[in-house]
């Protein structure tokens, strides 16, 4: 079994789409629009086959998102190398995104940066490698 895709509601569909395309090389479909409900969405495909659906609809409520809360808290991207982590961290910081920590090697062996992503929806963890789960 595998997770087929993960979905999240966002305020600015095109800005969020552009964020994932620019920094993570996502490929985007042409989008979907339901004229009866106003619902819109894009599917973003990443090079390893993972998919993220970003969605929007009229009259959504948007509450303040505390970084310490229950529920989904971050998306982690394995970008392949320490150099790529460093490069993306610098690029995202220069583009105005907040770097919360890193780049650094964590106690469990990840080389990562933690960045507050577009719309502060989640932390974006950039990782150089994945460790095995025990």
What kind of feature is each model-predicted range?
Residues 9-51:
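Core segments of cupin and vicinal oxygen chelate
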């Amino acid at each position: 079994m595998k997770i087929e895709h993960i979905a999240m509601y966002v305020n600015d569909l095109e800005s969020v789409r552009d964020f994932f395309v620019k920094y993570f090389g996502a490929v985007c479909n042409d989008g979907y629009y339901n004229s009866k409900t106003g619902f819109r969405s894009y599917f973003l495909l990443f090079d390893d086959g993972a998919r993220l659906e970003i969605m929007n609809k009229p009259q959504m409520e948007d509450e303040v998102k505390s970084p310490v809360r229950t529920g989904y808290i971050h998306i982690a991207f394995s970008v392949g190398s320490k150099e790529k982590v460093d490069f993306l961290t610098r690029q995202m910081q220069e583009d105005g995104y907040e770097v919360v920590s890193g780049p650094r090697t964590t106690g469990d062996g990840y080389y990562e940066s933690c960045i507050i992503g577009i719309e502060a929806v989640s932390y974006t963890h950039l990782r150089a490698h994945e460790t095995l789960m025990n």
